[in-house]
């Protein structure tokens, strides 16, 4: 269960609460992802984020780039994002399905962070279409969880469940990188091998980078 769960159940204010975590290691992980992509952004860059939620990442990046737009499937997320980002003239979020992207512009940077590639159920065809959004010389960043981060990741999802943001964790079926909740929620990840396969399929140069012992990045360059 991917896109639909986030669209129907875990959006807007609930999604905001997910990131209002008390777990310091999770806060470090979230910051490390943003810091990593920000190192490739400057004032001349145009950016698009896929699965932008309420604009958490966009708000952090907008001061460092020319413009940043996000797309998200949830109308509630988009409404909250427009309010959250209203003081940033170079930032916006629009309602759109990542599996049917109709944006006409192209960008220097494409972002799909915080395991969006898994939670949105992206297919190889989706990845090919996403690469069409990139200008020549641009870079696409996809991130998932590092296997080293399992204990902290599970603790975070347990916190979310305790706060009523997710269903109770199904401990019997949770493990080996997969978190299952009793309300039907299922969170998977991508392995380095899966990232390698997806990247090579595009025909463009790629690299796989582990960041902060918490994130695994697939970076594809349109060269």
Where are these regions (language model features)?
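Conserved class I S-adenosyl-L-methionine
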Residues: 1-42
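Class I SAM-dependent methyltransferase "Motif I" SAM/SAH-binding loop
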Residues: 51-53
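Class I SAM-dependent methyltransferase SAM/SAH-binding core
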Residues: 56, 61-99
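A short acidic, Gly/Pro-enriched loop at the edge of an enzyme's catalytic core
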Residues: 102-110
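A short SAM/SAH-binding and catalytic strip from SAM-dependent methyltransferases
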Residues: 109-122
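A short glycine-rich, Lys/Arg-flanked "PGG" loop and its adjoining helix->strand segment in the class I
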Residues: 124-136
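SAM-dependent methyltransferase
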Residues: 141-198, 207-208
